[in-house]
Regions:
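Active-site signature of cysteine proteases
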Residues: 1-126
Length: 126
């Protein structure tokens, strides 16, 4: 997805990303420091749009993506600073969001336009 490509490009090039999406999902386990989707999703774009339209995805929270890592199985996780304070969970206010949750529950991202890959900037008319 363009959301993932832009976010990955930004992080790779030293930028951070503002994330706007759903923190009310049952699999957004902030106290445990994880956000993930429990079942595989075949078409994230279609399913994300459907969830936004039927309001099963809420636009209710913003956070700050500062890094991306891979687990021992090769799954991508974004390392994210939450705004709820350093003492709000056992990870000092951070959490790991797996790529599937990011693709399904992201509503918007905020990034410096220089961090957007050239092909996507062109598509956007920037």
């Amino acid at each position: 997805s363009d959301f993932s490509a832009i976010t990955d490009s930004a992080l790779k090039n030293g930028y951070t990303v503002g994330w706007d999406g759903d923190a009310a999902d049952p699999y957004f386990d902030y106290s445990g420091g994880l956000a993930y989707m429990p079942e595989p999703i075949s078409n994230f774009t279609k399913e994300r749009q459907k969830a936004f339209e039927d309001q099963s995805t809420l636009l209710d929270h913003m956070m700050h993506i500062v890094a991306v890592v891979a687990d021992k199985y090769g799954k991508k996780w974004y390392y994210i600073k939450n705004s709820w304070g350093d003492n709000s969970n056992s990870l000092g206010g951070f959490l790991f969001m797996r790529d599937d949750y990011f693709k399904m529950r992201t509503v918007a991202i905020i990034v410096n336009k220089q961090a957007i890959p050239a092909a996507i900037r062109k598509k956007m008319g920037l």
